């Protein structure tokens, strides 16, 4: 607040938000919303995770990321945002199709918002970054993590049937 950075700050990991008492959390949620501070989670398996649903309900932008790809901290990172969406859903108890869709938004659309990306989406003139997967619904895709049939970046095919074609 003192530095005038409202809307230009994102806090990564934010493990502590998964450990605070309810009264403290309410005050923090208000401050985060008021200052437009985004929270980025990796949805870790071995640490507290920010209360994603509560954050979103309070009007806080939440994104998800994988900041380690088979590195010194974990051998499990792979930078797959569909998998990250599943982990966000799993760690936060998302069970309904609506909540599973929210997990996908967190790992895609909301990340783009935090980064200030424009032309992100599926409207005419957008970048045409997309992943094509088989599935009956978004909920099924998040829960089952089907193989990636086609991956486009900037409208260019970069992977087909799970293999890089560059």
Where are these regions (language model features)?
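His/Asp/Glu-enriched, well-ordered alpha-helical/loop segment
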Residues: 2-3, 36, 53-135
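Short C-terminal domain-edge/linker segments immediately following a structured domain
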Residues: 41-45, 69-71, 93-98, 160-166
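Active-site core of metal-dependent hydrolases
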Residues: 1-50, 61, 70
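Active-site/binding-pocket entry motifs
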Residues: 17, 87, 91, 157-158
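Alpha-helix N-cap/helix-start motif
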Residues: 21, 48, 74-78, 141
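Short, glycine/charged-enriched secondary-structure capping and boundary segments
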Residues: 24-27, 54-55, 77-80, 146-148
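C-terminal cap of metal-dependent C-N hydrolases
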Residues: 124-166
């Amino acid at each position: 607040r003192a530095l005038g950075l409202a809307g230009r700050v994102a806090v990564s990991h934010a493990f502590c938000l998964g450990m605070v008492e309810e009264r403290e959390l309410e005050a923090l949620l208000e401050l985060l919303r008021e200052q437009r501070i985004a929270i980025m989670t990796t949805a870790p398996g071995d640490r507290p995770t920010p209360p994603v649903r509560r954050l979103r309900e309070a009007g806080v932008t939440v994104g998800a990321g994988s900041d380690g790809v088979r590195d010194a901290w974990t051998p499990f990172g792979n930078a797959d945002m569909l998998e990250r969406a599943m982990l966000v859903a799993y760690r936060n108890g998302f069970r309904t199709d609506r909540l599973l869709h929210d997990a996908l938004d967190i790992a895609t659309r909301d990340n783009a918002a935090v980064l200030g990306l424009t032309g992100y989406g599926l409207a005419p003139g957008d970048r045409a970054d997309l992943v094509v997967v088989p599935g009956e619904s978004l909920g099924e895709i998040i829960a089952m993590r089907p193989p990636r049939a086609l991956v486009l970046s900037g409208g260019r095919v970069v992977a087909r049937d799970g293999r890089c074609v560059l």
